[in-house]
């Protein structure tokens, strides 16, 4: 889960740089040796090696002796130094002092100081505090106090901002006279801190008088992004180290990583690491490209990464047990570094407050939307915009705004879905010959999102058909099946339902007992019961999994069928949900005859077909990779309008939700543009986090206007906030429960042992748990 910046520089070049820094750290700055060394001397160990390889000046222009690389490369160096808690003044010298000099635009000072910093001959830092500078002869004298200055006790040059009659100005202090340094004992022993007191200390002016404010704001923003990268790799490395311990440690006769309680905790830590890594990556990407949302993205990363690093370090201690609580173990060092980092450039709470305020005030930086597709331009989306302008009428918009619940489509909607399907926009990722436009996943997702934004997309009742049945038939169907089922599905002529779950086979879907017995070469006789089938009461067809060979292990004797719901013997009974609606159904299949031509995929190979359907379901529940305003932004707007934003608890919950939602967007964005990424991993993470965000939204929305959501007129519709509250658990269950998603992440992404299943390899008719 390293910060891959493939979109900024050559992936191979970044990988080479990462390997180079990792080797230098392993040779000169190993964690095992650094922890026992003298703190001051330890911070200079390996400094010459970093200088010889040009790493100290990696982002310094070549004219000053640097490598002339960019922010992406500097982030890689920060990442690899942080992975092993390397105790160097790299942050202070290369990320603060050098950047402050460059931001000043003072070519004379840069030409004198930067080559020495790059060569490792000079260490420096940037101090922030309250100080005043007065002119004296050909110089300036500075008086003031600076607290918790990174490597301030040992830096040979201290850059600082001091007030003057012309405004805040940058100065360099290199002498000892008038400079009092207090080396502090620190929570994080790998990074030195000092308090500085200057009393009429001589300082050299750097840059123009009054120019320090904007220059240092840029430096601080860049340093905050780089520190987020450091926090992200700490969060990720804590997962890596803990995973190995859970695999190595054995108790009760097995690896402790097999225990679900530990698996779920590590899965949650892995999710946090993925989200904060995605947010750090996105922040670096946007900042390097000087994007409009760069400052907002950096603030999201600082909030997400600062929190996740501390949480994951604490979780590493917990999951290591007693050994993790010892001085000799390295776990506490990661906790110390992560916590100390939170206070360098603003706490997570401070960053969350900044984000929430920006959204509440509707600032442009908070409303910027960035898409994988639209960043590079999309002729297909341009075509969609033109098509919508020509085809969307007030009648279509009005019919979508007030659809008849649970009924078949109105004539207006039938006409609209037919036009949408004929143009290929209902199913844009499908091949053109089957009613699509042949777009890729990201571009197609952006097209669907645009239809949703306009309020003219296909309804929720079509979810199974468009997002599950269609892609599954495309992948597994014969040419005849594709020709038969796909075009009318694209035109909105048929609805589909999913017939997987049974009363005795929910999360353990492979235990299904609905049987399909051959009548002859052309027909099957199906008997059984299905449950939790959304919209089965209005469906024309169903995706059916049935057992065709009970002598095979439970995963091996299943076959997949496309069931005509109008067949004799199919009985659908609606189930009323806690909202009062009846989307769920139980379906009874009694001597239903299914033609063999409706069998999808190989005989007894239906489990693989079903898994592909479930993967489509998880992906489709989370939306396309877009970074921008989402549900949290909408809720903040509602909170401001209702006055609930003044409630500290509501504000805090919404700000946490805002950070998590933007971090999830960033992680999804990263997965879409990065090479060699496993889509299954990010889809499971997106499903888990999206479900959690949906639940939190339901809990918060009812609190925004409680006077309306707990009681309403007898003849009125249920308020949206009440419905949202009652539906909050919907996606924590639908499409695979959150607990199952944690199992998937732990076992398939992290590689922890699978849950014990005594029936896994037994013939189904000989299983133990019947």
Regions found by a protein language model. Give the residues of each.
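A generic, well-ordered mixed alpha/beta core segment in the N-terminal half of proteins
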Residues: 99, 103-125, 141-142, 147-150, ...
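A short, Trp-centered hydrophobic/proline-enriched beta-strand micro-motif
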Residues: 119-129, 160, 492-500, 545
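A short core secondary-structure module
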Residues: 127, 143-180, 523-575, 585
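A structural signal for short hydrophobic beta-strand segments in well-ordered beta-sheet cores
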Residues: 133-137, 514-517
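A short, charged helix-loop
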Residues: 192-222, 590-617
């Amino acid at each position: 889960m390293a910060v891959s910046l493939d979109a900024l520089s050559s992936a191979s070049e970044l990988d080479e740089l990462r390997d180079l820094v990792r080797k230098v750290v392993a040779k000169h700055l190993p964690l095992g040796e650094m922890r026992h060394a003298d703190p001051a001397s330890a911070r200079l160990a390996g400094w010459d090696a970093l200088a010889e390889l040009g790493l100290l000046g990696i982002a310094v222009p070549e004219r000053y002796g640097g490598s002339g690389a960019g922010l992406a490369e500097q982030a890689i160096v920060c990442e690899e130094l942080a992975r092993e808690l390397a105790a160097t003044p790299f942050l202070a010298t290369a990320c603060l002092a050098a950047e402050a000099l460059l931001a000043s635009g003072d070519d004379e000072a840069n030409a004198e100081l930067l080559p020495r910093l790059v060569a490792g001959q000079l260490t420096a830092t940037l101090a922030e505090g309250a100080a005043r500078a007065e002119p004296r002869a050909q110089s300036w004298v500075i008086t003031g106090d600076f607290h918790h200055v990174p490597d301030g006790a040992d830096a040979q040059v201290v850059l600082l901002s001091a007030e003057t009659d012309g405004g805040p100005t940058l100065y360099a202090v290199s002498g000892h006279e008038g400079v009092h340094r207090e080396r502090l004992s620190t929570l994080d022993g790998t990074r030195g801190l000092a308090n500085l007191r200057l009393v009429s200390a001589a300082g050299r002016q750097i840059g123009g008088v009054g120019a320090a404010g904007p220059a240092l704001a840029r430096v601080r923003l860049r340093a905050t992004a780089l520190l987020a990268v450091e926090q992200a790799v700490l969060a990720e490395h804590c997962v890596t180290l803990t995973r190995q311990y859970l695999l190595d440690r054995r108790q009760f006769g097995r690896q402790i990583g097999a225990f679900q309680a530990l698996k779920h905790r590590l899965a949650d830590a892995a999710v946090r690491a993925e989200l904060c890594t995605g947010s750090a990556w996105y922040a670096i990407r946007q900042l390097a490209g000087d994007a409009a949302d760069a400052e907002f993205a950096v603030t999201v990363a600082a909030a997400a990464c600062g929190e996740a690093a501390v949480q994951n370090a604490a979780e590493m201690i917990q999951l290591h047990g007693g050994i993790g609580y010892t001085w000799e173990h390295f776990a506490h060092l990661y906790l110390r570094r992560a916590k100390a980092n939170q206070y360098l450039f603003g706490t997570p709470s401070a960053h969350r407050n900044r984000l929430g305020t920006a959204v509440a005030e509707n600032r442009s930086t908070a409303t910027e939307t960035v898409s994988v597709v639209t960043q590079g331009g999309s002729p297909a989306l341009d075509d969609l915009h033109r098509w919508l302008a020509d085809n969307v009428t007030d009648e279509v918009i009005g019919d979508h705004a007030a659809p008849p619940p649970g009924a078949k489509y109105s004539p207006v909607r039938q006409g609209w879905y037919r036009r949408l399907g004929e143009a290929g926009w209902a199913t844009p990722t499908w091949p053109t010959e089957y009613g699509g436009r042949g777009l890729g996943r990201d571009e197609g997702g952006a097209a669907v999102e645009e239809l949703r934004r306009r309020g003219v997309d296909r309804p929720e009742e079509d979810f199974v058909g468009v997002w599950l049945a269609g892609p599954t038939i495309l992948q597994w169907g014969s040419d005849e099946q594709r020709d038969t089922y796909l075009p009318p599905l694209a035109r909105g002529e048929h609805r589909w339902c999913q017939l997987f779950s049974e009363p005795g086979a929910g999360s353990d879907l492979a235990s299904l007992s609905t049987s399909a017995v051959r009548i002859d070469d052309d027909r099957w006789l199906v008997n059984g019961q299905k449950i939790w089938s959304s919209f089965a009461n209005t469906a024309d067809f169903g995706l059916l999994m049935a057992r065709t060979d009970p002598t095979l292990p439970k995963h091996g004797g299943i076959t997949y069928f496309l069931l005509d719901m109008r067949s004799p013997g199919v009985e659908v009974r609606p189930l009323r949900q806690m909202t009062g609606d009846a989307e769920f159904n139980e379906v009874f299949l009694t001597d239903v005859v299914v033609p063999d031509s409706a069998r999808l995929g190989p005989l007894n190979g239906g489990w693989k077909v079903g898994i592909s359907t479930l993967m489509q379901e998880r992906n489709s529940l989370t939306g396309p990779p877009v970074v921008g305003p989402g549900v949290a932004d909408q809720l903040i707007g509602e909170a401001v309008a209702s006055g609930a934003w003044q409630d500290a608890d509501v504000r805090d919950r919404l700000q946490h939700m805002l950070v998590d939602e933007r971090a999830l967007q960033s992680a999804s964005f990263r997965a879409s543009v990065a090479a060699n990424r496993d889509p299954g991993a990010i889809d499971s993470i997106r499903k888990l986090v999206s479900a959690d965000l949906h639940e939190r939204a339901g809990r918060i929305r009812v609190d925004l206007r409680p006077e309306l959501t707990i009681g309403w007129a007898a003849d009125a519709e249920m308020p949206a906030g009440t419905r949202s509250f009652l539906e909050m658990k919907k996606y924590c269950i639908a499409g695979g429960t959150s607990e199952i998603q944690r199992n998937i992440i732990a076992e398939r992404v992290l590689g922890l042992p699978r849950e014990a299943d005594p029936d896994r390899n037994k013939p189904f008719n000989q299983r133990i748990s019947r």
